[in-house]
Amino acid sequence: MGSCCSSQDGDGNGKATAGSTVDSHELSQSVKGKIKQPEPKPKPPPQVPPAQDVKYPIYVGKYDYDSRTDDDLSFKKGDLMYIISTDEGDWWFARSKDTAGKEGYIPSNYVAEYKSLDAEEWFLGKIKRVEAEKMLNQSFNQVGSFLIRDSETTPGDFSLSVKDQDRVRHYRVRRLEDGSLFVTRRSTFQILHELVDHYKIETDGLCCKLLYPCLQAEKPQTAGLLRQANEEWEIEKTQIKLLRRLGAGQFGEVWEGLWNGTTSVAVKTLKPGTMSVEEFLQEASIMKRLRHPKLIQLYAVCTKEEPIYIVTELMKYGSLLEYLRGEDGVLKIEQLVDVAAQVASGMSYLEQQNYIHRDLAARNILVGEHGICKVADFGLARVIDEEIYEAHTGAKFPIKWTAPEAAMYNRFTIKSDVWSFGVVLYEIITYGRFPYPGMTNPEVLEKIQQNYRMPCPANCPKQFHDIMLDCWREDPASRPTFETLQWQLEEFFNSEGYRDPDAIH
């Protein structure tokens, strides 16, 4: 991945600023002509003379973006662009303000309106306190790093989070009746930029000066590999170059690949006969619409000939199971709980979308840079040919991860996913140990029906084991929701709440 970098934050005088990341790794564009390009779509919006650009809103780049096709527009963080058209939804047609009027499509979530609050690299908007703490506690953020976010409890107010020597401190940014903002009543400001500028110069009751906008661990996902992907995501295998085999399983292999000579991807190749192409495409069309920071994004498929290719985003460290068992996975309890919270976050989104994973396990969770974890392979278990599954595994389901009502009666629900999540918690806290050690699949089913549950592993906090037991309740309706599980894990270590300077000074 790219090296850690920093930039000056907004100073309220109209200078363009934008969000920073330390994950700037994207392979540079290369020999596009040697690789078959996507089928051309209708021409971009009509050319507009630069003299008329004054009609169009100006946006600023929040992250670097390297073009993936000839239709794209490359830009750097801080570059200014005219937005000519937003008709394509997640991909906007833009003209560069600074590079001889070059035009092309850009991902809309990589830019923000010039001089707006969203364009400030220290403004993160709607994120939780626990997310702010995790971001600021990353090793590349120094003491004095800060961010401002929307208040979780009071609409219209904000929260200021600052990295101190020993912890992250949180301050309420409140409003007076006249609309002015304050942290302490002795210092009031008309806009957030003024507040930030003031606390850059002096602490005035804060734990330290505001020195560095918070760096982010990764760029946001784009909506697919390219703008046409929303409608046309069946791609030719000639566009994919398989570089390195990452692993193999009972249904195929996983490769690191390069799409279109520009973009790193993961490619799952499925053994012939693993599933019906028609059923897979039907399920994949749903999977592709599921987008969340803690879900692996499905980019494209190749189904015209076997083996089927499933093209997704690439995660550096592979499966959580192998990560936990390897040298890189020697994690502290705080990190293990954070991994569990991330998985619960992705599953909470699937829960909201009324979507069932069916095969939740550490082997189907992937790990990237800076401890980022994402749920993978959601929905694939539904379209795997059951006879092939049974021939390879000796059972229709991975019994030790499967809820009893699903294993015995094929009743898969989000609550059966919750049961599986409890087993994932066991895998996490034991660094990838196989569940129900020493027991066969039939023995596991029999023991579970007799109310047996795995005991608390060594060095596992009782509170963590209690969450497992909640996931393994016999009555599916009595199991917690993933929303509840996410909250429980995010708040597992209750840090100090808001620090109110008015009460201290």
Swiss-Prot record:
GO terms, molecular function: ATP binding; non-membrane spanning protein tyrosine kinase activity
Subcellular location: Cytoplasm
Residue ranges, annotated region (Disordered): 1-53
Transmembrane segments: none
Reaction(s) catalysed (UniProt annotation): L-tyrosyl-[protein] + ATP = O-phospho-L-tyrosyl-[protein] + ADP + H(+)
Signal peptide (UniProt feature, chain positions): none
PROSITE patterns on file: PROTEIN_KINASE_ATP (PS00107), PROTEIN_KINASE_DOM (PS50011), PROTEIN_KINASE_TYR (PS00109), SH2 (PS50001), SH3 (PS50002)
Domain SH3: 54-116
InterPro entries listed in its UniProt record: Kinase-like_dom_sf, Non-receptor_tyrosine_kinases, Prot_kinase_dom, Protein_kinase_ATP_BS, Ser-Thr/Tyr_kinase_cat_dom, SH2, SH2_dom_sf, SH3-like_dom_sf
One matching Pfam family: SH3_1
Origin: domain of life: Eukaryota
Keywords from the named record: ATP-binding, Cytoplasm, Kinase, Nucleotide-binding, Phosphoprotein, SH2 domain, SH3 domain, Transferase, Tyrosine-protein kinase
CDD domains referenced in this protein's UniProt entry, alphabetically: PTKc_Frk_like (cd05068), SH2_Src_family (cd09933), SH3_Src_like (cd11845)
Active site (record annotation): D359
Residues annotated as domain Protein kinase: 240-493
Family, similarity comment: Belongs to the protein kinase superfamily. Tyr protein kinase family. SRC subfamily.
Name used for this protein in its record: Tyrosine-protein kinase isoform SRK1
Organism: Spongilla lacustris
Record lineage: Eukaryota, Metazoa, Porifera, Demospongiae, Heteroscleromorpha
